[in-house]
Amino acid sequence: EAAIPEEFGEPYREALTKLQKDAPPLSAEKVHRVLDGQLGTKWRERFASFDDTPVAAASIGQVHKGVWSDGREVAVKIQYPGADEALRADLKTMRRMTSVLKQLAPGADVQAVVDELIERTEMELDYRLEANNQRAFAKAYEGHPHFFIPRIVGSAPKVVVSEWIDGKLMSAIIRDGTPDERDLCGTRLFELTFDAPARVGMMHGDAHPGNFMMLPDGRMAVIDFGAVAPLPDGLPPEVGRMIRLALDKNYDQLLPTMERIGFIQKGEDISVEEVDAMLRQYVEPIEVPVFHYSRRWLRKQAANNMERSAEQIKMARQMNLPASLAIPLRVIASTVAISAQLDCHVPVRAMTEELIPGFADPV
């Protein structure tokens, strides 16, 4: 959406927001039926109160507000009945498309990437796994000056209950935030993306404006941990090294490093110009102390990619996407796109030096 011209972007953005807000809600009867099956028929005893009217739509469910028996305000996320079967049908379709994708990039390990995405999507269907992810993040960031993760109160396969948060959604900041709000929000988002792999051993995998909100004290609250990228050893140092070599235009070491990581297939002859053009949008923001992410800049990157479409098709046959990095790289791309929507200034160079393993290492 950030790459769409602004005259079209605003109605497009409003339509997406309306689509998410106006998703047909479950009736109270169906909500109670899900809670009966997931928390037991005496689930009402766990709540001091429960609002049958949903306050928000989630990716495959809806969120209700309630008060737990101990007086805490809670958010109750309930999975839509049948959402798991529908999503699994989509995954089967994705698996069948693997052969088509292989034709576009015949040397790449497409199957491994698709398997990784399917595995992560399957995990999103079990809210107990989401609850475990959120517990890990909440523990790792407890007392952190920049982030707040709500605690889990209870969970079941299709229901998760967590502490309620009041804050300003990132989507609202995108719409009408002040310059200071935009800059702080974008900075926090990059910090979380870069910091979590080493701190938690995971990366928040659903970089969406509806999953982040800013609190009055400047902390960013993070919700929805259904999609995470497991990185038990953090980001591979080779990734930071690759970015640094590209920044320094040290192509003698860059190309072998990319081949060693798995981005370039062994034996392929890729020119320096091709690699430089491909990595330009990732290197440009760290050439300056503070970078201005904007829709105009992102549209320029998209236009450049369109101009190089024939060249990119050729490169797709020479390059590969390591399966273990499929989701992390998607998250980083989403972080960039959201920052462009925020129209924010981010000290991404300093954060890269501090938080991306391998970037600051001697070459």
Language-model segments: residues:
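Broad phosphate/nucleotide-binding scaffolds in NTP-utilizing and phosphate-metabolizing enzymes
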Residues: 1-196, 201, 214-221, 225-233, ...
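Short amphipathic alpha-helical recognition elements used for nucleic-acid or partner binding
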Residues: 239-241
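Short adenine-binding "F-helix/F-box" segment of the Bergerat
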Residues: 236
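Conserved catalytic-loop position in the HRD/HxD motif
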Residues: 201, 206-208
